[in-house]
Amino acid sequence: FSEKNLPLLTSDAKLSKEYDAIIGSQTVRWEGEEVTLTQLSPVMLKTDRKNREKAWKMAAKRRLEDRQSINEIWIKILKTRMSIAKNSGYGDYRAWRWEYLKRFDYTPEDCLTFHRSIEKVIVPLADKLLKNRKEALGLEKLKPWDLSVDIYGREPLSPFKDAGELEDKCHNIFKSVDPVLGEYFGVMRKENLLDLDNRKGKAPGGYCTEYPFQRLPFIFMNAVGTHSDVQTMIHEGGHAFHVFESAELPFSSQRDVGMEFAEVASMAMELLASPYLTVDNGGFYTDKESSRARIEHLEKIIMFWPYMAVVDAFQHWAYTNPDKALNPDNCDSEWSDLWKRFQMSEHIDYSDCGDIISTGWHNKLHIYHVPFYYVEYGMAQLGSIQIWGNSLRDRKKAIQDYRAALSLGGNATLPELYEAAGAKFSFDDETLLNAANLISLGCILGEN
């Protein structure tokens, strides 16, 4: 702690808000209406390729209009964070932030090992998925606006009509995963601990929070009838079950779980619930639709890890080379190099996209709001895949281990929590390769 840092931390927060204001003001005219870039994003799912290209280029052009403004904010933020580290006696901001985030169970070098493993194991697998996408779409090369559309030209899944149906069917799914988890969700329904439907004037987003005195969870979201809503409900359900399972721990500090494992609870639940999404289990889908949902989910996991590595590696570079990172041109260059390392593929044509690729670091809010907070998602996803793999071998034991690990709250180290759940807190080639093989198997089973 350094009293000198109090005004600097306030300044850091204010600069993040300035960044938000810039991003929030980014709108374009689309089909006669002014829309935000977020509101424009569903066009990327449409089968009309010319419209996708038009929307992508329009969004890219609008983002680049704020290039100078975001560069200026970045310089101020970086200088502020350099001063915070210096005032506290740390050699660089990464070292200060590591301790601030209570990262006692892994080091920066562990993260760099994770990056290298992703490059070696996952990037080639992601490249195969891109090749399959290119061929299925009948294209010589993919363009950036071809990466989200369904490759078979199918309409998006439409699993439910209202929040009541979402509740009912998710309740059935949770009961199928484990009767006790079904009981927990029943308590949430009975005690009005769910606010799921989208309505005018409601705050955006979705999350699970806890009422610490009552030791009960509350789930908030904005369901509109999409498959993403189903995933969100099941994901947040995993967080809610974490609250229930750890409720017997006497002190709130014991129930405070790091994100590296908190997200295992939610991500693993998405996978553990996946066999029960079908109508004959009281769920939403036909067998064919359920297989589609599973494959899309697993493929997104593969595609996420390389992007996560870009975001995390960029921050390791920036905060250990702050003098270079104070020049936004160097940041553009570093991001481009990382993009080539983790995201470039012979199957994608990025020609004429240089500036929008190199300024990709402008678009990831975590860099401005919560530095170094992103790798946790990659770690947790790796843990969740291992738990899911256990369930394919012995479903009953996998669920028992999962619940036992949740009951520990934050009352153990990360390696101990992962081990209790039947997983390994490791980021080496072997661990990632085992996960990749499981995902590949899951995709094959989903197709049959």
Task: List the predicted regions and their residue ranges.
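A well-structured
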Residues: 1-157, 169
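Active-site-adjacent "gating/activation" loops or surface patches in catalytic cores
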Residues: 35-52, 155, 159-234, 238-243, ...
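Glycine- and acidic
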Residues: 58-66, 104-112, 149-159, 179, ...
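Short, glycine/acidic-rich hinge or "gate" loops at secondary-structure transitions
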Residues: 87-96, 131-146, 183-189, 249-255, ...
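C-terminal, non-catalytic "cap/extension" segments appended to globular domains
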Residues: 103-105, 233, 241, 271, ...
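Post-HExxH zinc-binding segment in Zn-dependent metallohydrolases
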Residues: 120-121, 257-288, 297, 303, ...
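Long, K/E/R/D-enriched contiguous segments that form extended
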Residues: 141-169, 288-289, 298, 302-304, ...
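Catalytic Zn2+-binding segment of zinc metalloproteases
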Residues: 238-252, 272
